[in-house]
Amino acid sequence: MAEFKHVFVCVQDRPPGHPQGSCAQRGSREVFQAFMEKIQTDPQLFMTTVITPTGCMNACMMGPVVVVYPDGVWYGQVKPEDVDEIVEKHLKGGEPVERLVISKGKPPGMF
């Protein structure tokens, strides 16, 4: 059986023109929906993976942000078309998608 994964997708929204912007304004709701569709149609992943929408994870300028636990891999600027690659390479294959990784093991820009 595959290792359990918990995927967090920031869907934080802010008012238009806010200087920090938000993941939602950069398309994170579509990213979340793409993960849900992919996971719910794959029997193996459906039993081993949870997808959770979250509020701000303080990496707004790199959004949409996705974090995979227990691996602690942070992805940035994720687009809906990146979801298949993250699912196949990381969730199923155990290898992060390096071109999208912004941090491993801790929130980006901290410590």
Swiss-Prot record:
InterPro entries with a match to the protein in the record: Thioredoxin-like_sf
Cofactor binding: number and manner: Binds 1 [2Fe-2S] cluster.
Binding site for [2Fe-2S] cluster: C10, C23, C56, C60
Keyword Electron transport on entry: yes
Domain of life: Bacteria
Cofactor: [2Fe-2S] cluster
Gene3D superfamilies in the record: Glutaredoxin
Family, per entry: Belongs to the 2Fe2S Shethna-type ferredoxin family.
Biological role: Ferredoxins are iron-sulfur proteins that transfer electrons in a wide variety of metabolic reactions.
Quaternary structure and interacting proteins, as annotated: Homodimer in solution.
Protein name: Ferredoxin, 2Fe-2S
Annotated organism of origin: Aquifex aeolicus (strain VF5)
Gene this protein is translated from: fdx4
